[in-house]
Amino acid sequence: MIDAVLFYVGLSMTLVGGVMDVVAAIGFFKFKDFYTRLHAATVGAIGGGFYPLVGLALMTLSLDIALQMKLTFAGICLLSAAIIAVGVPSGTHALARASYRSREAKPVVIGDKLREKLEGAKN
């Protein structure tokens, strides 16, 4: 019984990841600004990478194979998901900040607290 629940929860997480990848691809081509495109790419990387890996780990735990193989494969999937969960937001933040500071991409904003802070630090 628990195997079926694990399998279907994992399958649904994998499907959610696929849907998020499609939504991110549509957003990436629809948005015109660098920062909103970067946001769409991050949603695709997190949603399309993290959730399917966790779902795959759950589906693996529900299989009828040797315990060592189950735990090894599930552990690799969960470790990869953890690396994605930590690395993608950090990389996206670094990319957005570098783009902002080099003034390569002009943000369309209503208020800019970061510019005020940076100008205050220069004076």
What are these regions (language model features)?
Residues 35-49:
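Loop-to-helix transition at the N-terminal end of transmembrane alpha-helices
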Residues 1-5, 30, 36-39, 68:
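Juxtamembrane loop-transmembrane helix junctions in multi-pass integral membrane proteins
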Residues 45-61:
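A generic, lipid-embedded transmembrane alpha helix
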Residues 14, 39-43, 79:
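Internal alpha-helical transmembrane segments of multi-pass membrane proteins, especially GPCRs
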Residues 11-30:
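N-terminal signal-anchor/start-transfer transmembrane helix
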Residues 2-8, 58-79, 84-123:
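Flexible extramembrane loops and terminal tails that flank transmembrane helices
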